[in-house]
């Protein structure tokens, strides 16, 4: 007989830094087991924010799926800024290249709703614009 799903939660933790806390307690899962497995699974992504989808079952067991780091976080890292513009229409806080956008889009491709790398790049460019980050090299991009 299949296990009964009690809850599905989408959370974000820093890689290798998941700790038992209120957000995990509310799921009713074995918190030490989750934190150990999550931290082991994210060893190669140290310093990044890692979104995770946790499926909790009625017997306190769980499954989880790691997602790619959010585009906004990656853009801030590439642009070397702490936060985006408070008003992206009038402020520009940083500049990134189209090559930076391409590398982020290639990394994010599995989690994006895009069929081509160009479509993925357009989504990342939209995120950059909303953060007040200017993209250089747009004249080559259609």
Swiss-Prot record:
Q: Which Pfam families match?
A: Ribosomal_L11 (PF00298), Ribosomal_L11_N (PF03946)
The record's listing under CDD domains reads:
Ribosomal_L11
Q: How would you describe the post-translational modification of this protein?
A: One or more lysine residues are methylated.
Gene3D superfamilies annotated for this entry?
Answer: Ribosomal protein L11, C-terminal domain (1.10.10.250), Ribosomal protein L11/L12, N-terminal domain (3.30.1550.10)
Q: Name one GO molecular function term.
A: large ribosomal subunit rRNA binding
Q: Which UniProt keywords apply?
A: Methylation, Ribonucleoprotein, Ribosomal protein, RNA-binding, rRNA-binding
InterPro entries in the record: Ribosomal_uL11, Ribosomal_uL11_bac-typ, Ribosomal_uL11_C, Ribosomal_uL11_C_sf, Ribosomal_uL11_CS, Ribosomal_uL11_N, Ribosomal_uL11_N_sf
A GO BP entry is:
translation
Provide a GO CC annotation, any one.
cytosolic large ribosomal subunit
Q: How does it assemble?
A: Part of the ribosomal stalk of the 50S ribosomal subunit. Interacts with L10 and the large rRNA to form the base of the stalk. L10 forms an elongated spine to which L12 dimers bind in a sequential fashion forming a multimeric L10(L12)X complex.
Question: What family is reported?
Answer: Belongs to the universal ribosomal protein uL11 family.
Matching PANTHER family, A to Z?
60S RIBOSOMAL PROTEIN L12, LARGE RIBOSOMAL SUBUNIT PROTEIN UL11M
| Summary of the function given for this chain in its UniProt record | Forms part of the ribosomal stalk which helps the ribosome interact with GTP-bound translation factors.
* Name of this chain's protein: Large ribosomal subunit protein uL11
Organism per entry = Mycoplasma capricolum subsp. capricolum (strain California kid / ATCC 27343 / NCTC 10154)
Please name the gene that encodes this protein.
rplK
